[in-house]
Amino acid sequence: MRAIVHALKYEGRRSLAVPLAMLMRERGADLLDGAHAAVPVPLHPSRRRARGFNQAADLAKHLGLPISPALRRVRATEAQAGLPAARRHGNVRGAFVATRAAAQFRGRTILLVDDVSTTGATLEACARALKEEGIREVRALTAARVPTGGGPG
C-alpha cells in the first residue's frame, strides 16, 4: 500500500487514485453512508503548483459523493511526513479555515478525504475548522493509515 500511495503522491501516477478510491469505498462504506459531501484535505497553493495536483482531491472524485471545496489551507507548513509525531499537531495548527462553501453543510455530515493518516494531526486540524463553521459531524477516510511510530508517511 505504501508504494502505491507514494507513486500517486510523488510520482504523479494519478490513475492509481481510481483503484485506491474503490478500496476506500469498500472499507469505508459506513463512513460514506449519510455523508453529504466529500471534502479533500487541501494543499497550500504553492505545494499544489509544485505537485501539479492534489492527490486527496483525486481520491475524493471517485468516492461517489459530491465534492466540496469547504476548506482552504491558509498557511504553508512543513511536510508532515518529515516530522516526528510530537511536532505534527503544532505544524498544522491554524493552517486550515472553512470557506463559504462550508456554510451549506451547517448541521450536516461531511467526509474529509486524504491519502495517508499517521497521527491524525492534519485531519484533526481540518475537522476543527469545519466544526467551527457549524458542521455537525466530520468523518475522515484515508487510503492508508501508518501506525504511530511506523515512520514517515
What do these predicted regions represent?
Residues 1-112, 119-153:
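Conserved PRPP/pyrophosphate-binding segment of the phosphoribosyltransferase/PRPP-pathway fold
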